Swiss-Prot record:
Protein name, UniProt field: Transcription elongation factor GreA
Domain of life: Bacteria
Organism lineage: Bacteria, Pseudomonadati, Thermodesulfobacteriota, Desulfobulbia, Desulfobulbales
Matching NCBIfam families: greA, PRK00226.1-2, PRK00226.1-4, PRK00226.1-5
The keyword DNA-binding is annotated on this UniProt entry: yes
The entry's keywords: DNA-binding, Transcription, Transcription regulation
Native source species: Desulfotalea psychrophila (strain LSv54 / DSM 12343)
Amino acid sequence: MIDRIPMSVRGNKKLKEELLRLTRVERLDVVKAIEVAREHGDLKENAEYHAAKERQGMIEARIMDLKDKLGRAEVIDCLQVSCKRVVFGTVVVLLDLDTDEEVTYQLLGPEESEVKAGSISVLSPIGRSMLSKEEGDEVVTKTPGGTREFEVVEIKTGDFA
């Protein structure tokens, strides 16, 4: 069974660019670094060689991870989602009922969420608690810091990740 991964168009493009960079640049660079390190002789105590091999392993693992995620990606155009309810890709304006401050988040996948940039994962506690809510609904979220309460002020389309 393949679990689909919701991903924005921008997030999908970013992962494809990273995969391209890893396969066309970094993979080749690390192979050259291994060759150069081999020329220095004894591989048992060759720190350069071992560091390059370790880097190669990390690059190959990331390539496999990216191929897996891209293969399971369900690409969603955040500018085309419905704004009737909170769903993946929507931009949600919330009123924090404790502080009376407004916060704005875009719900994205775990691979592309960045709280500082205003995007949160649909799998995060607040992301899960917002799903399917409508404007005017109350959102109660249990976080490690305690229970937080918000009101959904506005739901709109956007792509500001």
